[in-house]
Amino acid sequence: MASLGFLFFFLLPLILLELSSSRSVMAAKTRHFKWDVEYIHWSPDGEESVVMGINGQFPGPTIRAKAGDTVAVHLTNKLHTEGVVIHWHGIRQIGTPWADGTAAISQCAINPGETFLYRFKVDKAGTYFYHGHYGMQRSAGLYGSLIVEVGEGEKEPFHYDGEFNLLLSDWWHKGSHEQEVDLSSNPLRWIGEPQTLLLNGRGQYNCSLAARFSKPPLPQCKLRGGEQYAPQILRVRPNKIYRLRVASTTALGSLSLAIGGHKMVVVEADGNYVQPFSVQDMDIYSGESYSVLFKTDQDPTKNYWISINVRGREPKTPQGLTLLNYLPNSASKFPTLPPPIAPLWNDYNHSKSFSNKIFALMGSPKPPPQNHRRIILLNTQNKIDGYTKWAINNVSLVLPTQLYLGSIRYGINAFDTKPPPDNFPKDYDVLKQAPNSNSTYGNGVYMLKFNTTIDIILQNANALAKDVSEIHPWHLHGHDFWVLGYGEGKFSEKDVKKFNLKNPPLRNTAVIFPFGWTALRFVTDNPGVWAFHCHIEPHLHMGMGVIFAEGVHLVKKIPKEALACGLTGKMLMSNKHN
């Protein structure tokens, strides 16, 4: 195993180094990309499917830029029968809220045959990704990596000799359109567990790279190496230090990642540096990204497994695998030991232990000491007219046919003006089944005063089934937030004293554990309309999300292409003819 000296090797410079805030404006570039989004035939796991690809490939192309650069993506919709948008996950879109890529929220969907220019600045180095944000297009395969390196003249607060990127996802053989119909049916037809876990879009169905160790038994995968589903092998040299960037764009699953025989040192989370800590395995929820460092200090005559396993749900999907190939060994030389054993799927104490080890690196921005407003969001599973839905404070989100950003900016009455509730009834028991028969659909907006501090308490509860409460990773668009803490049961005022105001991590995605709460804090300093939602694709489709608006009057001229639908489109036409 990696020695403790490895951890100290990184720990000392990470503690001593101050974060640089300088940006080399003169060296910033505009990086242009021309993308066509279309359905293509592909074999992500050995079974040919129709996937949503970009420029004929799956996953989509990796974008690499430097902090301070401008990214310009000319995206053409070649889907023929449906609209499309792309969300740049983790990019705050400061000054460009219309480029956030959320249909009906920040922009109108891009119609078939149309081209939309996403132009935005990547202001902060980190590990990010992008994905579809219209219907369930992420489940259809519309995603890729977005890596932002430090700006010219800057250095990372750690050393490494090389880097790799792993984009994690899950894959169903049932198409995303059929999944949408199933989730909208009465009674509900649940989509079930994915057939395969993918690493960089590659997995193996009905066979295993580690067949001799698999339980239940699976045949050995017979690969030549050129198949679309053949694993992307990580080739390394002995006694080197590598950075592994990892992000999860799963539609459903929470995952555990491990490298056989190697410890990992976590140094980045969601584009923010953290105090380094060593782990044997790590949880990664949908919407999260990390960087870990590992040292190739094991027996150089062997290769090692890299594995991902399902967490938080009963694992009915085989683990995903690839190889850490110590050169000059052949990549066909399989490890002699079985893949790393994952923690039990419902060992939430293990998961909480990992989350509670994440602290901001010294020199990171600190949260304001007090809030101006607290919003407590209770997530429950409900029945509305017989349909199974998720609701927040008894309201299940249904996006309007009109555009939030344009409607608010130009004073168009396009959605429910009644604000959603800031809390839920005090007598609600989060530990018991509750039908919540008074739940409703809604599209109201939380109007947040500009440049104020907001606390969000995510409160989990029992679902419709007895003694069932699920993990939910929540993602905020347009912002990073401070994770102030986690707790068990129902949040109360006395829990405030448990908040970590000294070194809470900055994140854009945070998990809420079963029957527990998570406390977040952010500052409303980015004018726009921003989604805040569970990053599990079926849960968002079933209503688990809210909408925040802040400082919309400060938003500068919105590109007409982002407004060209519904009432904002009519406004454009009216102005054209007047």
From Swiss-Prot:
Keywords: Copper, Disulfide bond, Glycoprotein, Metal-binding, Oxidoreductase, Repeat, Secreted, Signal. It comes from Nicotiana tabacum. One of its GO terms (cellular component) is extracellular region. The gene is AAO. Cu cation 3 binds at H133, H477, H533. GO terms for molecular function: copper ion binding; L-ascorbate oxidase activity; oxidoreductase activity. Its main location: secreted. Its cofactor is Cu cation. Binds 4 Cu cations per monomer. Highly expressed in young and growing tissues. Disulfide bonds join C108-C565, C207-C221. Cu cation 2 binds at H89, H131, H535. Residues 30-149, 161-328, 372-550 form the Plastocyanin-like domain. Dimer. It catalyses: 4 L-ascorbate + O2 = 4 monodehydro-L-ascorbate radical + 2 H2O. Belongs to the multicopper oxidase family. InterPro entries: Cu-oxidase-like_N (IPR011707), Cu-oxidase_2nd (IPR001117), Cu-oxidase_C (IPR011706), Cu-oxidase_fam (IPR045087), Cu_oxidase_CS (IPR033138), Cu_oxidase_Cu_BS (IPR002355), Cupredoxin (IPR008972), CuRO_1_AAO (IPR034259). Cu cation 1 binds at H87, H475. It is an enzyme of class 1 (oxidoreductase). Its EC number is 1.10.3.3. May be involved in a redox system involving ascorbic acid. Cu cation 4 binds at H472, C534, H539, M544. The lineage of its organism: Eukaryota, Viridiplantae, Streptophyta, Embryophyta, Tracheophyta. The keyword Membrane does not apply. Glycans are attached at N206, N349, N394, N438, N451. This is L-ascorbate oxidase. Residues 1-28 form the signal peptide. It is found in: Secreted.
